[in-house]
Every structure is written in structure tokens, then in C-alpha cells.
């Protein structure tokens, strides 16, 4: 286990007067045991944002690790997400309550619609349920995940409420430049998941060369690039040493030519499902 906790990540302002750490850890794909160990390690190291989802099946494990940490609830930022099966006004509100029960928490800091699943046509109703959940104190902030510019605009136009966050696939191969601009116009924070492109850039010559110049790992360079774009970022790991390394990205800054070089890797490669056609989880 790494030693002293690293400094907590800086925070970014949300459009609802709340704040969120710009960097945190997600637990997608981890078993209960892996989740409990990873979250415990992350919290001990200094991470304060933990991202889970109903569809991950590990909310209870996240809750156990949080409870065991002894860290005051107010110091943590916990995100979870509503599954597509629970789209709908009443269903999404009830799903939030069920997530709280599994987490063992009185509230979450951010509740997201996991996927728009546009063919089902219920994501706007689901967001209405999130508005209700926020009003009842189940969540501090509400947002969306995997939403396109069209989906975000529909939610705003039909509910008159702007999501605080849009969490999307975003990495140098898919830098989401247009979507980031659209989010910013709505004052929606863009939060990147898969910032490491599922390992596909670990040996990329551009990335490794830049990492060598700064004495950093390719992972640190990829996270730093994302943060310098102005995004919030969620990384995934079950390894305590990797978690510590991933959190240690606030003591250096990439020069503009290196940012440009990484931007040049963008070729539109999508590693996760297409939000326009995916039926969701």
C-alpha cells in the first residue's frame, strides 16, 4: 500500500452551485471484492470521488468501503447512475432510493442517467425523475452520461433544467471536441470516462515520447491531457499503486505543443457503444 495520502484533487464548479473533484475513480467491471479493495485503497491514498452505477452491481461494495474508511461523508463525492430499465419519471426516482439503500448512504452527490437509449424514448421522463429525486434530497446534483448534444438539448428544452454533468467516452482517439463545446455552451461539465483509451495508447510513440520528456508515465500524460482540456476525469483501476500514480497529475503541466500532438491522435475511434443506437444497460 502506498504511504502518505496524496493531496485531494482540485474541485470544479457545477452549474447548481455545488462542486466536484476534477479527478476520481470508477469501479466499472470490478467484482465486489475488487471494488471494496480498490475503493478502500483509493480513499486511503486521498481520492475523494468514487463513481459507480446500478448496472455495475457493486454499489453495496462501494458503500462498505466508504463506511469502513471512517472519512466524514461531507468530504466524499459519490456518483451513481440509473439503469435503462428504470427510465421513466417514477422509476428513476425509485431507482435512486434503491441505490441509496445499497450504498448505505442518505444521499449521493451526483445521480446520472447511464445511457440515453433513444429508441426507448424515455430519457427525458427519466430526467424528470432525477429532478424529483434532487428535490427530495436523494442527490445533490443530477446529470447525464453518454448523451449527445441532441440528447442534452432535448432534456433542457423539455424539463427546463440543465444537467450539471455529461459523462462521456473521451480520450485522444475520440476527443469529443464538438460535444465539449456544446456542453460548455450549456454550462455543463464534461466528465471523461475511459481516459486511458482502454490501454490502447499505453505504447503509442507520441504518448510515450511525451511521457519521457516529463519523467511521467503514459497514463499520467493521458490524464493530464484530459484535465488540461478542462474536463473532469474518471479513471478505473483495481491496483493501489496505479491508483496513486493516476492521482499524481497536478504537479506538472503539458506544454501547448504536447497538447497539440496528443490532440492529433484523434481519429474518431469509439471504444464503447454508440449512444445513438445502444439500448443501454
Swiss-Prot record:
<feature type="binding site">
    <location>
        <position position="272"/>
    </location>
    <ligand>
        <name>NADPH</name>
    </ligand>
</feature>
<dbReference type="InterPro" id="IPR018170">
    <property type="entry name" value="Aldo/ket_reductase_CS"/>
</dbReference>
<comment type="similarity">
    <text>Belongs to the aldo/keto reductase family.</text>
</comment>
<dbReference type="GO" id="GO:0004033">
    <property type="term" value="F:aldo-keto reductase (NADPH) activity"/>
</dbReference>
<feature type="binding site">
    <location>
        <position position="246"/>
    </location>
    <ligand>
        <name>NADPH</name>
    </ligand>
</feature>
<dbReference type="Pfam" id="PF00248">
    <property type="entry name" value="Aldo_ket_red"/>
</dbReference>
<feature type="active site" description="Proton donor">
    <location>
        <position position="56"/>
    </location>
</feature>
<feature type="binding site">
    <location>
        <position position="237"/>
    </location>
    <ligand>
        <name>NADPH</name>
    </ligand>
</feature>
<protein>
    <recommendedName>
        <fullName>Aldo-keto reductase MMAR_1744</fullName>
        <ecNumber>1.1.1.-</ecNumber>
    </recommendedName>
</protein>
<feature type="binding site">
    <location>
        <position position="245"/>
    </location>
    <ligand>
        <name>NADPH</name>
    </ligand>
</feature>
<feature type="binding site">
    <location>
        <position position="234"/>
    </location>
    <ligand>
        <name>NADPH</name>
    </ligand>
</feature>
<keyword id="KW-0560">Oxidoreductase</keyword>
<keyword id="KW-0521">NADP</keyword>
<dbReference type="InterPro" id="IPR023210">
    <property type="entry name" value="NADP_OxRdtase_dom"/>
</dbReference>
<dbReference type="InterPro" id="IPR036812">
    <property type="entry name" value="NADP_OxRdtase_dom_sf"/>
</dbReference>
<feature type="binding site">
    <location>
        <position position="196"/>
    </location>
    <ligand>
        <name>NADPH</name>
    </ligand>
</feature>
<dbReference type="InterPro" id="IPR020471">
    <property type="entry name" value="AKR"/>
</dbReference>
Amino acid at each position: 500500500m502506498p504511504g502518505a495520502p496524496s493531496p485531494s484533487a482540485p474541485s470544479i464548479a457545477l452549474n447548481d452551485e455545488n462542486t466536484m473533484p476534477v479527478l476520481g475513480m470508477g469501479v466499472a467491471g470490478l467484482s465486489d471484492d475488487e471494488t471494496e479493495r480498490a475503493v478502500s485503497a483509493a480513499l486511503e491514498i486521498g481520492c475523494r470521488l468514487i463513481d459507480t452505477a446500478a448496472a455495475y452491481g457493486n454499489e453495496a461494495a462501494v458503500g462498505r468501503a466508504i463506511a469502513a474508511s471512517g472519512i466524514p461523508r461531507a468530504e466524499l463525492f459519490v456518483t451513481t447512475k440509473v439503469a435503462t430499465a428504470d427510465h421513466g419519471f417514477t422509476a428513476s426516482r425509485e431507482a435512486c432510493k434503491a441505490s441509496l439503500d445499497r450504498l448505505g448512504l442518505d444521499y449521493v452527490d451526483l445521480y446520472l442517467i447511464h445511457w440515453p437509449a433513444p429508441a426507448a424514448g424515455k430519457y427525458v421522463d427519466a430526467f424528470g425523475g432525477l429532478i424529483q429525486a434532487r428535490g427530495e434530497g436523494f442527490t445533490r446534483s443530477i446529470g447525464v452520461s453518454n448523451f449527445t448534444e441532441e440528447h442534452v438539448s432535448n432534456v433542457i428544452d423539455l424539463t427546463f433544467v440543465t444537467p450539471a454533468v455529461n459523462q462521456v467516452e473521451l480520450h485522444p482517439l475520440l476527443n469529443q471536441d464538438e460535444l465539449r463545446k456544446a456542453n460548455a455552451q450549456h454550462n455543463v461539465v464534461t466528465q471523461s470516462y475511459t481516459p486511458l483509451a482502454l490501454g490502447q495508447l499505453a505504447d503509442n510513440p507520441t504518448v510515450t515520447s511525451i511521457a519521457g520528456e516529463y519523467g511521467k508515465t503514459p497514463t499520467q500524460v493521458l490524464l493530464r491531457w484530459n484535465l488540461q482540456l478542462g474536463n473532469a476525469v474518471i479513471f478505473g483501476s483495481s491496483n493501489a499503486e496505479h491508483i496513486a500514480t493516476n492521482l499524481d497529475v497536478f504537479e506538472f503541466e503539458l506544454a501547448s505543443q504536447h497538447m497539440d500532438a496528443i490532440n492529433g491522435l484523434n481519429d474518431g475511434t469509439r471504444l464503447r457503444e454508440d449512444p445513438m443506437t445502444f439500448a443501454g444497460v
